[in-house]
Design a protein with these regions (language model features):
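Cytosolic catalytic domains that perform sulfur/thiol-centered chemistry
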Residues: 1-279
């Protein structure tokens, strides 16, 4: 895939704002690293940030509605029938042109992109730079909530985008895939899936919102064998989607996200490796 098939720049969206074919979604997730649960509970949620100001006409993409309600691990994608129904309920049809973005953290938007594309939404792009870049380009914001009318949607799942725990176990044992950790290097050094390389999502972005240039991304992923199966993972399947998109922009088409990521891997008591001395 080409970069322009995956990303839309703010100027293009500005020129097309109001196009009735567009379905725009704010997929913001707010993470409060270093805070206690009690402190984080007092901070704004993604929905509250959206309500305070968003791209005009954008609806809110509530990640929880696309998540398995009885799954053991947070953010794992919903079962097929539920996912397809929720996509249609959100206003996305098979011929919709979808734009997703985030107020902060590009990976929040790429998670929405990955979920929707996995289910068969073909025409979907991520706003590069998110809401900060939109404002910088002269875009206005509006407060309050917007919703789209439901639309008929028939799923056509792209199973190759999804890596299960069993596939990752097989890759660890047989070495038949390139496993890539999207978490920070110091976290990776502490613990990671055996054999995994580390490419922190922050290496792929400027700040938290803007995907680096094509040349910069190519330099970062050049060592990854082109054509070989690439499986990206992180803590809970969010950051890993940004790495997966980055691979696609430079032609590494055989890339999947380990949806359960470390939440599932550690929760199931599977082996971990460490780079720390004495570990």
């Amino acid at each position: 895939m080409k970069r322009e098939d995956l990303l839309i720049e703010p100027g293009e969206l500005l020129a097309r704002l109001g196009d009735p074919r567009l379905r725009i979604y704010d997929a913001t997730i707010m993470f409060y690293m270093g805070m206690s649960a009690e402190e984080a509970a007092k901070m704004p949620t993604g929905r509250e940030v959206y309500l305070g100001g968003h791209v005009p006409g954008a609806a809110f993409f509530d990640h929880q509605l696309f998540t398995d309600p009885i799954g053991k691990y947070e953010y794992m994608v919903a079962p097929d029938q539920m996912l397809a129904a929720q996509i249609g309920e959100s206003g996305i049809g098979n011929h919709s042109e979808v734009i997703v973005y985030a107020s902060s953290l590009l990976a929040s938007a790429t998670r929405a992109w990955w979920v929707l594309r996995y289910a068969g939404v073909e025409n979907i792009r991520v706003l590069n730079g998110g809401l900060p870049a939109w404002k910088e380009a002269g875009g206005t914001v509006e407060a309050g909530e917007h919703q789209y009318d439901p639309a008929p949607f028939t799923a056509a799942f792209k199973r190759e985008m999804f890596a299960s725990k069993e596939e990752v176990q097989g890759a660890v044992e047989r070495g038949n895939a390139y496993i890539e950790d999207a978490l920070m290097q110091d976290w990776h050094d502490q613990e990671h899936i055996p054999g995994a390389a580390c490419l922190p999502l922050t290496d792929l972005t400027i700040g938290w919102d803007l995907l680096r240039s094509q040349d910069e991304i190519w330099a970062l992923v050049a060592a990854r064998p082109k054509g070989e199966r690439v499986i990206t993972y992180c803590g809970g399947g969010i950051a890993a989607t940004l790495n997966a998109m980055a691979h696609l922009t430079v032609g590494n088409e055989n890339v999947a996200v380990y949806d359960g990521s470390l939440f599932e891997w550690k929760g199931e008591g599977l082996p971990l490796s460490s780079n720390n001395t004495g570990a």
